[in-house]
Amino acid sequence: VVTSMGGLPRNIRMAKAPPIKCQGIKTKLVPFIFRNIRWNESKGGRWIEPFLGSGVVVLNLAPERALLTDTNQHIIHFYQAIQQGEMTPAAVREYLFHAGRQLEQQGENYYYEVRDRFNRTGSPFDFLFLNRACFNGLMRFNQNGEFNVPFCRKPHRFTPAYITKITNQISWVSCQMRGKEWEFRVASWEEALRVASPDDFVYLDPPYIGRHTDYYNHWDMNDTLRLAQAMRQLPCGYALSMWLENRYRRNGLIDMLWDDLELRVYRHFYHIGATEELRNWMLEALLIRPGFAVPIHAQAELGSHRQSHQLSLL
């Protein structure tokens, strides 16, 4: 994976996964995103993500300068802890080894003990543990802002190999950040857009309307309309990820709000059950400000690529 080429576009075969998981994570879409966006990083601008989520896009891009915001303070504090050297690979390995052993011995009782502790203290180590030990890797908070996802029922989850995998992800994140001017900030998307300058590039990955929302991820039509209006005021390039179509319906918002943007489409499949018959397709849209999209014919220079991939939603 190329980590620094002066912006975009670039060709990568496969993106690396971050240490935390969340719904709608874009790991498999990163190569598609990188092929289609044009951004000249050498002008000194920042890569801005107002909806950081898992951080998978910026971590694979590894720009020199970035503003990374989210309303979920736990995501921001997690990456700040890595950036500031609190969560080193060695510290994470030691923590997960101990926590994994306790989970084996006490089962779900230990999981809920950690969950209660996290909801009191907000420890980034506990956040990582819960994210990897909870049901389906969900990240969900109740109306009081408390993590409320149940246990995954796998007390032997933290095997030596699994701990090594997570530790390596922490090491990779630390490496991608090192020497970079990245600002992680707990902030609304409005605050992030407000400080954008002409040489920046804004990548937007808002929650989907209709998908489960929680304390940190409430999103409705009014939010979408406000975002669409705010995007028009940006002084720089931007791109928006949004679902376009599945076998049941098409997202009418794209034609209604963003028909003037460059549209790039990625087709993938996901399973909703154990059999082949339950495999569904989905079209994902990348909507790019005119002048900042890589022409389709120019993408051949970046290398051939498959148009359809198997994609896990988690």
Where are these regions (language model features)?
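Conserved S-adenosyl-L-methionine
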Residues: N36, K43-G100
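A residue-level signal for conserved active-site and pocket-lining positions in enzyme catalytic cores
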Residues: G53, Y79, L128, Y238, ...
